[in-house]
Structure formats: C-alpha cells, structure tokens
Amino acid sequence: MTVPTENQEAEKLTNWLRANNYKFTHIANESWLPPRVAMLAAKRKKRMWLSPWFPDYCIILKRGSLLFIELKKQIDYSKSDKGKKVSVTSKEQIEWCESLNNIANTQAEVCNGYEKAKETILYIESI
C-alpha cells in the first residue's frame, strides 16, 4: 500500500473540514516552484515575514477555541528503518507549537496524516 503524500493528506483534511462546516485557513507556506521563481518567492516571503515553520492549518473549533495543525505525511511502517521516509518536525515548528500552546483557548498539534488530524479535532471538540 502506498502512503499518501502530504499534499494528498492536506486535500483530504480540507475536504473533511469543509464538509463539516469548520471555519479554517490553510497557511500556504509551502510550494514547489522552478528554481529561479522559488528564489524570488522566498525573498518576497521573507520580506513579508511569512514563517516557513508556522503550522499548516488554523481551525476555529465549534466550541470557540483555536486549533493549529502542523500536518505531516503518515509514517510508512512497511519500509525498513533505513528506507523509512518520515516527514520530520523541525525545531522551529516545535517552537511555534509550544508558543501557540501558551495562548488561552488555543492548541497546536503535529499530526501524521489526515486520519490523525481528524481524530485530534474530534477529540478536542469532545472534551
């Protein structure tokens, strides 16, 4: 079985959030561009202070709090340890999540895959 890409996971999460009437935004701080265009885009993002480490999603939960999700691809357990492709959470991403978790009525989580993100949302909504 092929593990979905991070973009495929993001599409699933976006569709689920829309279908369940959540107010949210996907922070577009990642993209693939040709090298020359990417260099110009990176300079523009830096001038605008767009953090490449900020969580991917900001969701207004139905109970009135905020949830930030850093979405990573699922872990592929079918590969050997040497061949395992894991989407690593950077030190800066962890720092962002820790900072956001210090704000009242706000929670930030790293989720490996759409299913984990959905479970996290439903769990937080239930408490």
Task: Label each residue range with its predicted role.
Residues 1-127:
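Catalytic phosphate/metal-binding cores of nucleic-acid and nucleotide-processing enzymes, i.e., regions
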